[in-house]
Regions:
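Polar low-complexity intrinsically disordered regions enriched in Ser/Thr and small residues
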Residues: 48, 57-60, 68, 113, ...
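Segments that shape or occlude catalytic/ligand-binding pockets
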Residues: 30-67, 71-72
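Short, surface-exposed loop and linker segments with low hydrophobicity and enrichment for Pro/Ser/Thr
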Residues: 10-21, 64-80
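Active-site loop segments of alpha/beta catalytic cores
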Residues: 1-32, 116-357
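A contiguous, low-structure linker/loop signature
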Residues: 69-123, 142-145
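Surface-exposed flexible segments
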Residues: 37-47, 91-102, 339-340
Length: 357
């Protein structure tokens, strides 16, 4: 196959199962510094995944104000944010930690916070904000593929952002009705978001992710996650948009449920040895969904030769290669980024031209 594609065009075609010259290699915009080695990789096909700026804003009429202040506590630099709602105050305490953030206190601390959280999530207004996205899109040109975000799934936001797993488990058993009130309010907020996304200049959107099946389980996934994916797809897909989800954990338990969704692509799927499904199993389970995988994080600790061998094996597992993109969605050990990317790229250029035998 002879064609001249920019990195962006290659990704945009591959995720739609259209013909490409070779399997795309991508990396998040925050995972790679701009430098000579990065430029050489881009010249050789590496595509940057530009996640933002977003295409919408949110106005919360029940929020009266929010204040943040930073201080040192036991040698730690932390930030407390206090949000005042019409039904009470909510607060968080976070600690910046290099490339991540430690959440020492989440918004929900006990049953007394339900009223304030419900006020926070209710009567939300979603407003378009397309200009920043359009400017970034023009700046990036053919070097980056632009990706938008719907936001976390309503239940995922409650579990991981507002409560934390342990607290959620207790609340789910003790005060499920209160949890479901929050869930319904967030579902309504998402429903207001979908038309704004459909009318936006962005062509693809991730809807949440980081689902942990061992915690959520198949039944709750089907009841509280899948319907939201479907509602989103019903609005966005007729407008020509693609909808995917960041499934980077063990997905075997929910593989059948994922297969039944209308999602266009599975993003950050991390094959064995890091999770409980191989790439071949994922392709068999989800034949109609593009697989925008994360190159297994543990393999970055191996030699360049071993990384190249694993990349070749992944390409063969996904033969003939349509609808496959290899991405880097996690942090890479110090000193391994550029050697590893070059190893993967060599495998792609030597063994990843379509159709893969």
């Amino acid at each position: 196959m002879t064609m001249e594609l920019t990195p962006r065009e290659r990704c945009e075609r591959a995720v739609r199962f259209e013909d490409v010259d070779f399997v795309p290699l991508t990396i998040y915009e925050r995972k790679i510094p701009q430098c000579e080695a990065e430029r050489e990789l881009r010249n050789d096909g590496l595509c940057i995944v530009q996640r933002g700026p977003g295409v919408f804003g949110v106005r919360r009429p029940n929020v009266l104000g929010s204040e943040s202040h930073s201080f040192v506590d036991n040698g730690r630099r932390v930030t407390r944010t206090v949000t005042r709602t019409t039904a009470g105050e909510l607060s968080t305490l976070v600690q910046p930690a290099g490339f991540t953030t430690w959440h020492h206190e989440k918004m929900f601390k006990g049953p007394d916070d339900y009223a304030a959280l419900l006020a926070y999530a209710s009567d939300v207004e979603v407003v378009p904000n397309y200009e920043p996205f359009m400017r970034m899109d023009e700046l990036k040109g053919g070097d980056a593929v632009m990706r938008g975000a719907v936001g976390l799934e309503p239940m995922q936001l409650i579990v991981h952002h507002w409560m934390g797993v342990e607290v959620f488990a207790i609340e789910w058993m003790e005060r499920r009705d209160e949890v479901l009130k929050l869930y319904e309010a967030l579902v309504e907020e998402r429903r207001k978001t979908y038309p704004v996304l459909a009318a936006s200049p962005c062509e693809q959107f991730n809807y949440g992710g980081n689902v942990t099946p061992e915690i959520i389980g198949e039944a709750r996934f089907r009841e509280y996650y899948v319907p939201n994916y479907e509602e989103c797809c019903e609005v966005l897909q007729p407008a020509g948009k693609l909808v995917g989800c960041h499934f980077d954990a063990n997905t075997r338990v929910i593989a059948d449920a994922i297969a039944e969704t209308s999602l266009d692509y599975i993003e950050a799927f991390t094959p064995a040895p890091d999770t409980d499904m191989t790439l071949a199993e994922a392709r068999a389970a989800w034949p109609d969904k593009a697989l925008w995988i994360n190159y297994p994080s543990s393999v970055w600790l191996r030699s360049d030769e071993a990384m190249e061998e694993v990349a070749v094996d992944l390409l063969k597992q996904a033969a003939p290669g349509n609808g496959l993109l290899i991405g880097v969605t996690e942090d890479v050990p110090d000193g391994r980024l550029y050697p590893g990317l070059n190893a993967i790229n060599r495998a792609i250029h030597e063994h990843g031209r379509l159709p893969i035998a």
